[in-house]
Amino acid sequence: MNRMKTLWSVLGALAILITGNTFAAHHEKGESAANPPGTPSANARQARAAQARAMRASTEACWIKSNTRQLGDWEFSGEWSNPQGVRTRFNGEMTVTQKSPGTFQAKGKNLSRDNEFENVWGVKDGKYAMNDNPFTVAHCSELENGNFFIVQQWTGQNGEFEWKAFFAADHVTNVNQFRPLSIEEHNEAPYAPFLTRWDTRVK
């Protein structure tokens, strides 16, 4: 996920972006000509766009609120399985802080492997990223008693990743799923979920 992108992948991404923007501009121009302002079709299109913006803003506000609630010191434990079903258990400690509005940081140590780690994630201008790797928030909802349910997804050079989390006051339960993209990395294997739990805050 953190590997440097190749020149071709960057050029490919730029080509897709330019093509997409050009298509969107022509499509919008043609749609505006077919549906002049004030017509029922144009009004419906504007209503859909406004609704989409409102939903994105609501999801972003929910996501920031849920992450802000998790600030503090945590112990964590969990296990993950490779495509062959071999399980590895892990545990550690970390501290979650807010670097700036909408940006968060976790510093900790994996006690099982005796290695330290640092992750930074946040949202800016409607775009989400962790350690400069973009991701999407597919769902965020605030449940009873101030609990949250979140679904995040992203695609890297090695595969697709989905992260589902239940945030409560004294614990966080994460279920992660990874699907490799290449045959060499067992592309035929289905999603193999693995669990991580943030236990009661360190006293």
Residue ranges of model-derived segments:
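Bacterial N-terminal signal peptides that target proteins for export
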Residues: 1-11
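Amphipathic/hydrophobic helical signal segments and adjacent flexible N-terminal regions
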Residues: 11, 20-91, 186-203
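Intrinsically disordered, low-complexity regions enriched in polar/acidic and amide residues
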Residues: 45, 50, 97, 151-152, ...
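Central antiparallel beta-sheet cores of small beta-barrel/beta-sandwich binding domains
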Residues: 59-60, 64, 75-164, 194, ...
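Edge beta-strand at a domain terminus
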Residues: 163-203
